[in-house]
Amino acid sequence: SDVCSSDLLLIFGLASLIFCAVFAYIYWCNLKSARHLMALKQSGRKVPNFVEDFKTLADGRFHMGLMTVPLIGVLLFTILPLIYMICLAFTNFDHNHPAPKSLFDWVGFSSFGEVLQGRMAGTFFPLLTWTLIWAVAATATTFFFGIVLALLLNTKGLKFKKVWRTLFVITIAVPQFVSLLLMRNFLNDHGPLNGLLQTLHLTNGPIPFLTDPLWAKFSIIFVNMWIGIPFTMLVATGIIMNLPTEQIEAAEIDGASKFQIFKSITFPQILLIMAPSLIQQFIGNINNFNVIYFLTGGGPTNSEYYQAGSTDLLVTWLYKLTVSAKDYNLASVIGILSFAISATFSLLAYTRSSSFNEGAAK
């Protein structure tokens, strides 16, 4: 019988390797210090005693002592789980090999082949496509309509500007999961919206906002706009209020229209400042777990997918593979591929953005 648990063996093995690496580094630092002391003695200079070494550590290297505990925490709770997750992708740790009942084996890249070319490819690539479409749509809509709303609220002559801003900011103050659960009840087949539409005889039956794949995807994007637009509006408002008025006044004197001013002055300035935030929002939307999980739960169900629904993103599919299906190796592969996609896009987008190029030039 298998007494040992493979996952515990792997965790303790990785922890031992990390401990050995830390010990080797400390030992190397000790040898380096001993060599330095020997050089001092051979040159006839004074060798510091224990009290002097302690004062040097307490004064000149005090930051090293402060960083010891946080560094241990990072190693145990960030580095170790990350390496453990990567290692699982190269095993057959799934529902057929549950720990501690059975031991899993190292299988190389077979899990990657299963996801990219095997039975999981029919789920992975459609979900990857929808994830990218969702990330682009969610980022673009909140950015565009947030700027439009900021311009409207900063229009000259508009009364009660602070009141309007406060009303829109309320959606930020409300916890996101509360808003999503309320919208889920509001949009379901027997919710208030469908009830109102049928009472007014605008529809013969309930509109499947959350139960039809296409309707559900549009509903998710719309609800995300409700949550994300106020944040973009606040950021854009701060940028607009600090734009140099000389350029705008000069453009108005030259006869430029409001659209021309927006196109040539306002929008480029907003885009320059918000470019890093836009990239961050795009990556965040790729891994936006809350909106999908609380609004549709990944549904409606799709019989052609493995452990996934029509609106699942890669991150929510990863969650289902881990919690429901117990396919930890496949979930690890999805996590690695998602990270590779996000990291590649981030590097390319950041290095090619105007904000990065201006900072590098300075």
Kindly give the residue locations of the regions a language model identified.
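A structural signal for multi-pass alpha-helical bundles of membrane permease subunits
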Residues: 1-20, 24-40, 62-362
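Membrane-interfacial, low-structure loops and terminal tails that flank and connect transmembrane helices
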Residues: 39-58
